[in-house]
């Protein structure tokens, strides 16, 4: 069972601690742009005692996507896009993982053990999932469903940042553009970025 000092309880959140996520709507109700920032923050509720790791470790890339929220906010402003961002560390639950993933609640992160997650109980996992993960994704679905009902085909831009070195591998890329099947947005974007700077590795 997880150490009691790390156990999450919504009732123990301080009045000064934020909701699990922040939503910014668009001034243009028919804007096609939808920006997400899953790993915007490295905040941990005070009663969870930083999950048992140091502040130095939490401030590394393992705790959040450094700089991602600033980019997401600026992009949202430029595009007049809706924005939803997570308000707590990815080490509590990873909003960019399915709940079945072994890294959904990581026991280690880039070589750093996360004591609060090593012997986590099913009850604790459920509490965290409902509070931090479920409502975040339900709100995304509701927003997208509303747009589609209004005849708007949304373009989702998920903002992340990545560390130049991960697990002793030096990543050569300046920018990563990930997509699943639909290339209508990502290929023109790649071409435009390379047009502006042909030295970029994408």
Feature names for model-found ranges:
Residues 2-156, 161-202:
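N-terminal catalytic or cofactor-binding beta/alpha core of small enzyme domains
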